[in-house]
């Protein structure tokens, strides 16, 4: 539409003109504006602005599609690091696709109540709120502006749990000192993505709740706190699928390879044992489209590329019994790996416990002797007691060292099972050659090049000589 400069002098005039030109109450118009808005966010990402906030739409669509939140069952969806709201708008679209001509007004109104997002930074929070408005969420009050990770560990209640979590938590960053200081000691970290994973598993998902999370390769192969988190994930949840994405999906923001982890929160098993809900993990290696060597701004990943994954996916209801291995898909028997590792490590752990108990017995004896020596003033009587204390303390320290060595030996056999950075065993093998053979071939090729060069020089010299001889004869 055309307006004169006079109408553009004040913000209110611009808003009034927009209201005249655009019917914001028309759903189709708002949906179109929502698409335009998301494209603008994509362009900002490609230009290097707000890049940390945007996940490619193909990824948000695919993850929402696979988690499959149900409108009929009124399943709630949360993104605890919602950025500009890409996952939430994908959930909105997924809910709306479940509407039909028979759907009630209550069904349509329910969509707005089933969403929750939390964003730490003001700009992406504003962009997210706008995004939700343009996608037909009239009162996006459920998009909160605060730091999810700064909420006290014990401040999360059962009412905060949701049916579905779909998110791309910031990875590679660290929270300020003090954030997460009340997390359980074995889960305490400042790495942002790790903190989100602890929250999702322990605080956000209901029993049988489903999640899809974007995580880098570093989470899959990481040890230390990451290994502890993966044990928590595999124990408390059923990690059924890892989609491995190629490089460049999130370029230019990052070229780090990323993965989509899909898992379901298991029911609590209170039988005194350490029950693991994950038995089998399926992997799917997403390939580049034919002719692609990477993704870029002009060649982004597309939702249509995930059609093979959708066709292969199957149903969790029958434990994905219809899945088959292929050039891109393979499964890992995690239960067998875990049981074998535990069996190999257990003797070392038992030995560590035995040595620790022996050390504790000696340390208790040392404490008793120290208590008894307090009432002995005679130096001659004290000396043998002090000597015994020194001997027992030395023996206890030696046992503690042996116990630590035994524990470490068991840990070295056990903890590698939590390296989930597993390569595709079904991929075509790359051709390899012996370096010595290649070097010999290279030398032979150089000799052939030299021989050809010398032959050309000889022929050129002969041709020039013939040319000059002919000229002299003509003269």
Go through the PLM ranges and name each one.
Residues 2, 47-53:
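Nucleic-acid modification enzymes, centered on SAM-dependent nucleic-acid methyltransferases
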Residues 12, 16, 30-34, 38, ...:
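Non-catalytic, well-ordered alpha-helical scaffold segments
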Residues 17, 35, 39, 62-66, ...:
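Residue-level signal for well-ordered alpha-helical scaffold segments within enzymatic catalytic domains
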Residues 156-475:
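A conserved structural/catalytic subdomain of Rossmann-like adenosyl-cofactor enzymes
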């Amino acid at each position: 539409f055309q307006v004169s400069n006079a109408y553009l002098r004040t913000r209110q005039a611009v808003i009034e003109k927009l209201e005249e030109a655009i019917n914001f109450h028309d759903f189709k118009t708002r949906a179109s504006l929502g698409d335009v808005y998301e494209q603008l966010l994509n362009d900002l990402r490609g230009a290097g602005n707000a890049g940390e906030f945007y996940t490619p739409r193909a990824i948000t669509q695919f993850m929402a599609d696979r988690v499959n939140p149900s409108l009929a069952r009124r399943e709630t969806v949360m993104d605890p690091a919602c950025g500009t709201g890409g996952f939430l708008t994908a959930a909105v679209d997924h809910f709306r696709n479940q509407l039909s001509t028979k759907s009630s007004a209550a069904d349509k109104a329910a969509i707005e109540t089933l969403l929750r997002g939390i964003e730490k930074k003001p700009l992406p929070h504003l962009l997210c709120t706008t995004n939700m408005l343009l996608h037909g969420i009239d009162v996006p009050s459920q998009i909160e502006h605060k730091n999810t990770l700064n909420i006290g560990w014990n401040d999360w209640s059962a009412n905060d749990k949701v049916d579905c979590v779909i998110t791309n938590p910031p990875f590679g960053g660290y929270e300020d000192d003090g954030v997460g200081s009340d997390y359980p000691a074995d889960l305490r970290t400042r790495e942002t993505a790790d903190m989100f994973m602890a929250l999702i598993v322990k605080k956000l998902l209901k029993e049988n709740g489903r999640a899809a999370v974007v995580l880098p390769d570093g989470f899959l192969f990481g040890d230390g706190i990451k290994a502890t988190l993966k044990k928590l994930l595999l124990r408390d949840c059923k990690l059924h699928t890892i989609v491995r994405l190629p490089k460049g999906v999130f370029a230019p923001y990052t070229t780090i390879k990323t993965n989509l982890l899909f898992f379901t929160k298991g029911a609590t098993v209170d039988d005194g044992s350490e029950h693991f809900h994950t038995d089998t993990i399926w992997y799917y290696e997403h390939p580049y489209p034919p002719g692609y060597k990477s993704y870029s701004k002009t060649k982004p990943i597309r939702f249509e590329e995930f059609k093979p994954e959708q066709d292969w996916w199957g149903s969790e209801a029958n434990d994905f019994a219809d899945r088959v291995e292929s050039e891109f898909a393979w499964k890992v028997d995690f239960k067998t790996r875990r049981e074998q590792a535990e069996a190999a490590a257990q003797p070392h752990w038992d030995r560590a416990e035995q040595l620790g108990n022996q050390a504790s017995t000696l340390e208790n004896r040392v404490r008793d002797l120290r208590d008894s020596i307090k009432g002995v003033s005679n130096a001659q009587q004290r000396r043998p007691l002090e000597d015994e204390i020194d001997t027992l303390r030395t023996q206890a320290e030696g046992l503690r060292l042996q116990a630590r060595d035994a524990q470490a030996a068991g840990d070295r056999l056990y903890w590698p099972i939590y390296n989930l950075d597993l390569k595709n065993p079904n991929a075509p093998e790359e051709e390899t050659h012996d370096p010595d053979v290649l070097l010999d071939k290279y030398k032979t090729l150089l000799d052939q090049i030299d021989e050809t060069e010398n032959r050309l020089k000889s022929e050129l010299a002969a041709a020039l000589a013939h040319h000059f001889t002919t000229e002299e004869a003509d003269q």
